[in-house]
């Protein structure tokens, strides 16, 4: 089960899971993106899903009661400091970036527990409790909460066959990144600034993060839980 599978890291991870032989349930709020994904990868089960809707998540959990893997990839990057963040901005970011994961984990965990196993992978960010980043006030706050949520689930269910880990990427190529760059004026200068964050002097690729997600979801990482896995081109050295 993959959220935000329509583009970027979510799409790359859904494809990577499928390439490993998984039966992938790919979800996204964008039906057009799902249609494209389904056409290119007809073995996937594609479902439109608004992760801000408890009712939609509950309905999906009745169709897929016990997934082996849950990859929570949905997220939104709000630009600005605390002075740029209204209560509405705060509530939206936390609802989408954190509460959506609470909803999906709470919906799918019972089936995992009945099965006696399950791997949950949550998308956090290097801009979180790992380190700060300028103009990422509510984004960093919400992604820090994802780290806390991940560790809490990991410790509560570690003896019941459930693993829960978080991925903390640096700046990764994606349509959402392109949108943020375009919104800030001098496109080439802004792009150079994003690239300069990483000592490797390049942006990450969705497929690189997808490979880490596959590892954390698989039995190859069976002795790993409650961890924040940084993949950031050296940003946090």
Located regions from the model:
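Short, small/polar-rich loop/turn modules that mediate ligand/substrate recognition or access, typified
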Residues: 158, 163, 224-226
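Alpha-helical segment proximal to the catalytic Tyr-Lys
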Residues: 110, 155-156, 222
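Substrate-binding pocket helix/loop in short-chain dehydrogenase/reductase
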Residues: 81-82, 89-94, 194
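C-terminal substrate-recognition "lid" of short-chain dehydrogenase/reductases
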Residues: 102, 202-231, 236
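Active-site helix of classical SDR
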Residues: 105, 142, 150
């Amino acid at each position: 089960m993959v959220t935000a599978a329509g583009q970027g890291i979510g799409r790359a991870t859904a494809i990577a899971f499928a390439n490993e032989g998984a039966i992938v349930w790919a979800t996204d709020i964008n039906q057009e993106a799902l249609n494209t994904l389904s056409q290119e990868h007809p073995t996937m089960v594609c479902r439109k899903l608004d992760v801000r809707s408890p009712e939609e998540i509950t309905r999906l959990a009745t169709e897929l009661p016990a997934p082996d893997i849950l990859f929570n990839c949905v997220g939104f990057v709000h630009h600005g400091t605390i002075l740029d963040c209204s209560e509405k901005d705060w509530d939206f970011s936390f609802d989408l970036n954190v509460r959506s994961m609470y909803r999906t984990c709470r919906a799918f965990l019972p089936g995992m527990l009945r099965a006696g196993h399950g791997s949950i992978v949550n998308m956090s960010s290097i801009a979180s409790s790992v380190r700060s980043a300028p103009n990422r006030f509510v984004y960093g706050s919400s992604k820090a909460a994802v780290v806390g949520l991940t560790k809490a689930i990991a410790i509560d269910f570690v003896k019941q066959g459930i693993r829960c880990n978080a991925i903390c990427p640096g700046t990764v190529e994606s349509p959402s990144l392109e949108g943020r760059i375009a919104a800030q004026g001098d496109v080439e200068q802004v792009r150079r600034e994003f690239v300069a964050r990483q000592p490797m002097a390049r942006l990450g690729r969705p497929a690189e993060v997808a490979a880490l997600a596959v590892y954390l979801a698989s039995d190859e990482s069976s002795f790993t839980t409650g961890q924040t896995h940084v993949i950031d081109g050296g940003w946090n050295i």
